Amino acid sequence: MSRSDPILIVGGGLGGLTTALALAQHGRPARVLEGALQFGAIGYGIQFGPNVFHVFDRLGLSEQVLAIADLPVGVVMMDALTGKELIRVPTGPSFCARFKYPYIVVHRIDVHNVLLDACRRNGAVELVSDARDEI
């Protein structure tokens, strides 16, 4: 396998698109195979901690992700049976200062669209939909 052969990535979700972009940034072409007729995502709210936001920063996407994200002032975990508060973690400025990156809440489809747009702009990433028989 030469460095010009694309790395095959099965699945065009958040992980597949992120992997393709990371490979492309390191000079490796990537081919993302998605079984659906078109690239897209199912939607629900998700949370990303500083460790994940660091990846967006490395991909050059932190500004786009911040534009679509909410920055909660804290996270509270509660006992599902009793309703008792178990822990409260402030996620404001001191949190960001400590961990370098924010804790965000965002809609999964919005993050997927940011990654998908970045892949489409990157000449080293090939996106193949309806790829069930192509492998």
What are these regions (language model features)?
Residues 37-57:
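Conserved N-terminal glycine-rich FAD pyrophosphate-binding loop of Rossmann-like flavoproteins
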Residues 16-17:
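N-terminal Rossmann-fold NAD(P) dinucleotide-binding loop
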Residues 13:
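Glycine-rich NAD(P) Rossmann-fold beta1-alpha1 loop
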